[in-house]
């Protein structure tokens, strides 16, 4: 069977002989008692689920969270993915006080990070992680010294949100523009991957596109057709072609179009759906 492995956070905590609590229910009395006994000044939360008030309100100064966007924009579960899907040129990280609502507490500090043309969700995640730890330290120092003032979020319905990724919102919509398709692919790479139904040799299946480039060129091909040109795979669009550089077929590994074509053939009627 598969062996359970501890997270890197747990492994580091164990190396420093720090107490580790892993309750099934965050409201259970034993867990609350353990936290209370710590007499903590503040809790720091990163990449965790919503905490109940009985937990985040325990410390003297409350609890702070690190969020991977410039709040109030992109509140929600998948901010890194959605800034790329929406074609943003910049994003950032925010520390804020936790309150009753998701990602809505008073802002403490923010750090802006530029988004490069070649960034995908994986590379942007790494950029933000690199900036995150120093921002948390600066936030804690500011709270400790009393020099850091928080400010309430100005939340309106017009702010972009970052809902949880699902099969529905990660599917490629082929009526979109080429840049919208490329942005979605970047925003969902390496995980979970932008996907589409396709038909080849009369059989339908699902594929994922992990990397693509846009080619703006007039053509007379039917839309959504899969074309093979040499060792490249193109999908036709009203603006030109989507050059699919890395693809993953069902039950296969992610691979380059050249590698894929070494053992897989698309017929003349192949298309995305």
Q: What kind of feature is each model-predicted range?
A:
Residues 179, 200, 205-207, 265:
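Intrinsically disordered, low-complexity regulatory segments enriched
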Residues 97, 198-200, 213:
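A general secondary-structure junction signal
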Residues 202-217, 243-246:
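A short acidic-to-branched-hydrophobic micro-motif
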Residues 213-242, 251:
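Low-complexity, glycine/alanine/valine/leucine- and proline-rich hydrophobic stretches
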Residues 197-204, 237-239:
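Short acidic, glycine-rich loop/turn motifs
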Residues 1-190, 195, 240-243, 249, ...:
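One-carbon transfer enzymes
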């Amino acid at each position: 069977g598969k062996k359970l492995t501890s997270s890197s956070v747990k492994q580091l905590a164990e190396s420093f002989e720090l107490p580790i609590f892993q309750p099934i229910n965050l409201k259970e009395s034993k867990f609350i008692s353990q936290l209370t006994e710590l007499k903590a000044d503040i809790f720091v939360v990163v990449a965790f689920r919503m905490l109940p008030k009985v937990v985040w309100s325990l410390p003297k100064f409350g609890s702070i969270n690190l969020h991977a966007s410039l709040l109030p924009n992109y509140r929600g579960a998948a901010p890194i993915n959605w800034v790329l899907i929406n074609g943003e040129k910049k994003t950032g990280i925010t520390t804020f006080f936790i309150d009753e609502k998701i990602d809505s507490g008073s802002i403490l500090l923010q750090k802006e990070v530029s988004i490069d043309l070649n960034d995908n969700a994986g590379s942007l995640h790494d950029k933000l992680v690199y900036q995150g730890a120093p921002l948390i330290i600066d936030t804690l120092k500011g709270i400790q010294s009393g020099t850091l003032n928080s400010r309430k979020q100005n939340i309106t319905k017009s702010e972009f949100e970052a809902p949880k990724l699902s099969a529905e919102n990660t599917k490629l919509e082929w009526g979109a523009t080429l840049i919208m398709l490329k942005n979605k692919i970047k925003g969902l790479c390496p995980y979970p991957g932008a996907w589409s139904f396709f038909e080849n040799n009369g059989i339908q299946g699902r594929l994922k596109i992990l990397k693509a480039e846009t080619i703006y060129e007039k053509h007379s091909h039917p839309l959504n057709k899969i074309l093979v040109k040499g060792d490249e795979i193109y999908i036709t669009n009203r603006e030109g072609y989507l050059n699919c550089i890395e693809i993953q077929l069902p039950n296969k590994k992610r691979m380059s179009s050249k590698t894929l074509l070494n053992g897989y053939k698309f017929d003349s009627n192949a298309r995305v759906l």
